[in-house]
């Protein structure tokens, strides 16, 4: 049985980037297996933040591969993401992985999917996972209508998402990078 269910949100402003994830791991459609999973972490000497949604074991495989790409390309986030997406799309083993990752540095937020997509949002806000739509909507509203810093927008948006999405809890891990 697959273990999944999460929300990851990244928000970028003129001072830096924040990424936040909830801690809930759900088995199937009915059982919460863990409340305090850590799905957001720093990579490459704390210069990159990465978060995942989907199958946990698959996500760890993707994190390891992405960190190798960062080392190969001297921390160049965009190049590493493009190379990772190419491998993911063309490798028989990787294509079967059921996870999605979001990576960010102080300048970029990128969503990397198994279809070979590398997507950078136009507005500096991106979200993945079951509660992603709720968190994204809240973050965009706060970005447009307040002067809150990125970390505060991320926190408040995840609080809203956790009130709506049954697969998202309020045990958050928040990581930030300054420009």
Curated annotation (Swiss-Prot):
Chief localisation class: cytoplasm
Reactions that this protein is recorded to catalyse: ATP-dependent cleavage of peptide bonds with broad specificity
Single GO biological process annotation from the record: proteolysis involved in protein catabolic process
An annotated GO cellular component: proteasome core complex
Xref: InterPro entries: ATP-dep_Prtase_HsIV_su, Ntn_hydrolases_N, Proteasome_sua/b, Proteasome_suB-type
Subcellular location(s) per record: Cytoplasm
Keyword Hydrolase assigned: yes
Leader peptide range in chain numbering: none
Active site: 6
GO MF terms, alphabetically ordered: metal ion binding; threonine-type endopeptidase activity
Assigned EC number: 3.4.25.2
Top-level enzyme category: hydrolase
Family, similarity comment: Belongs to the peptidase T1B family. HslV subfamily.
NCBIfam families: ATP_dep_HslV (TIGR03692), PRK05456.1 (NF003964)
Complex and partners: A double ring-shaped homohexamer of HslV is capped on each side by a ring-shaped HslU homohexamer. The assembly of the HslU/HslV complex is dependent on binding of ATP.
Protein known as: ATP-dependent protease subunit HslV
Organism this protein belongs to: Maridesulfovibrio salexigens (strain ATCC 14822 / DSM 2638 / NCIMB 8403 / VKM B-1763) (Desulfovibrio salexigens)
The encoding gene: hslV
């Amino acid at each position: 049985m697959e273990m999944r269910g999460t929300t990851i949100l990244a928000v970028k402003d003129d001072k830096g980037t924040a990424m936040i994830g909830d801690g809930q791991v759900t088995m199937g459609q009915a059982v919460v297996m863990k409340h305090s999973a850590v799905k957001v972490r720093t990579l490459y000497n704390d210069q990159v933040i990465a978060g995942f949604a989907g199958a946990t074991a698959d996500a760890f495989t993707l994190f390891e591969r992405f960190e190798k790409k960062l080392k190969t390309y001297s921390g160049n986030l965009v190049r590493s993401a493009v190379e990772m997406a190419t491998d993911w799309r063309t490798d028989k083993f990787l294509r079967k992985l059921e996870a999605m990752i979001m990576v960010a540095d102080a300048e970029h937020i990128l969503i990397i999917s198994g279809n070979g997509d590398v997507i950078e949002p136009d507005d500096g806000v991106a979200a993945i996972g079951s509660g992603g739509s709720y968190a994204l909507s809240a973050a965009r509203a706060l970005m447009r209508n307040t002067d809150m810093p990125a970390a505060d927008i991320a926190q408040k948006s995840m609080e809203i998402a956790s009130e709506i999405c049954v697969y998202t809890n309020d045990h958050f891990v928040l990581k930030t990078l300054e420009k």
